[in-house]
Curated annotation (Swiss-Prot):
Species of origin: Methylobacterium nodulans (strain LMG 21967 / CNCM I-2342 / ORS 2060)
Ligase keyword on record: no
Binding site for substrate: S10, K42, A79, R93
Pathway(s): Cofactor biosynthesis; coenzyme A biosynthesis; CoA from (R)-pantothenate: step 4/5
Principal cellular location given in the protein's record: cytoplasm
Name by which UniProt lists this protein: Phosphopantetheine adenylyltransferase
Root EC class: transferase
Length: 166
């Protein structure tokens, strides 16, 4: 398998849902590029460097076990531009439910119009991770809740440290 795919997102933070999609994608491609979107108008909880570190620590072993190369990059422009820079022929997108499908179909259509050489592949979320969103994880962590069921252990530790009361 020498196909390259790009999986773009904010990953703030990386969740078990993201990891599920990454695991599935690594089974399909020889090289998976995870592209962290950096947008000047947004204030993320974790810096792009921290998010990249968390993704690598969590997902490098998964990619290795699946026989896929994993690369983490940042981008501040269009995902199609990031895909072209990465030499990707596929966009990977995870789907949790019908609402995701509606949005992702629009996005796939626009991406296809801009980069017809890059095909979108939808990967359905495994049952146990469907309700997980990074937004909900951040909210739970900010209120002192236990996020361990929703994120990798290292991410849970970083969230606890970030929201620790002095």
């Amino acid at each position: 398998m020498n196909r390259t795919a790009l999986y773009a997102g904010s990953f703030d933070p990386v969740t078990n849902g993201h990891v599920d999609v990454i695991r599935q994608a690594c089974r399909l491609v020889g090289r998976l590029v995870i592209a962290i979107g950096v947008h000047p108008g947004k204030t993320p909880l974790f810096s792009a460097e921290e998010r990249a570190e968390l993704i690598r620590a969590t997902c490098d072993p998964i990619a290795a076990a699946e026989g896929s190369a994993l690369e983490v990059v940042t981008f501040d422009d269009l995902a199609v531009s990031a895909a072209r820079r990465a030499g990707a022929s596929l966009f990977i997108r995870g789907l949790r439910d019908g609402t995701d499908l509606d949005y992702e179909m629009q996005l796939a259509g626009m991406n296809s119009a801009m980069a017809p050489e890059v095909q979108t592949v939808f990967l359905p979320a495994s049952t146990g991770v469907r309700p997980i969103t990074a937004t909900l994880v951040r909210q739970i962590a900010a209120m002192g809740g236990d996020v361990r069921p929703f994120v990798p252990e290292l991410v849970a530790e970083r969230l606890e440290a970030r929201f620790a009361k002095p």
